[in-house]
């Protein structure tokens, strides 16, 4: 055997060995990835029994749900170990656009949920951090003209919602998705002024007890400005296009007042009393 022939055979052997090694590595990575997906899927089903029961009734059942599951890896606390963003598709966890978003971190042999109350169509990692973990921005469809942008910050144990903004897509105008109406100490009445536009309402939360009497008076230069009042159980309490309302409350909790308009930049003044 000549030296040149030996070298050719040696190179061929090395190339074949490298190719076989690559195939083995890829197969191992695929197996590891499938094992990870199976464990994360099982964790979601264990944490959310209602989701499991719903998925079992869907066409294809749990097998199809696991196949369609999307998993993204993020190193949220920069420790070299990834956390996992998990999204399931289908009506059990999604609306028309928004889907439930879960984030897990590895803990011993299993996984621990660190974000479990988010819903939207994407997670963005912000440059800022809180308690060592990257802040998160979840974007969600609100209406055809608006979207919600929720900022989540880590409190040392879990991600908690820190800010919830409503954004008008055409104009870029934004405002808090809701605000709590504050009464001064000892006062039973509060007045607020604001400005609303098409698809960009003002939403107020008012805490009250069953048996109390609530009165709402709304004044505005434009007749297109009106309000909607909902009970803690989301039952509507006023007729359309209301400007004032008085009633005895049947529930204890947060009542929601939504002020909107069919015109742009509509100003208003609202007075709420609870006695």
Per-region residue spans from a language model:
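Bacterial N-terminal signal peptides
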Residues: 12-22
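Extracellular beta-rich ligand/substrate-recognition surface
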Residues: 58-66, 191-200, 237-238
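Bacterial N-terminal signal peptides that target proteins for export
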Residues: 2-14
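Non-catalytic extracellular/lumenal accessory regions of secreted precursors
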Residues: 173-203, 211, 275
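Acidic, Ser/Thr/Pro-rich low-complexity intrinsically disordered segments
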Residues: 196-255, 259-260
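Edge beta-strands of jelly-roll/beta-sandwich modules across compartments, strongly enriched
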Residues: 263-275
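Acidic, small-residue rich beta-repeat scaffolds with periodic aromatic anchors
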Residues: 26-50, 125-177, 273-275
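Acidic/hydrophobic-patterned starts of short beta strands in beta-sheet-rich repeat architectures
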Residues: 77-89, 130-140
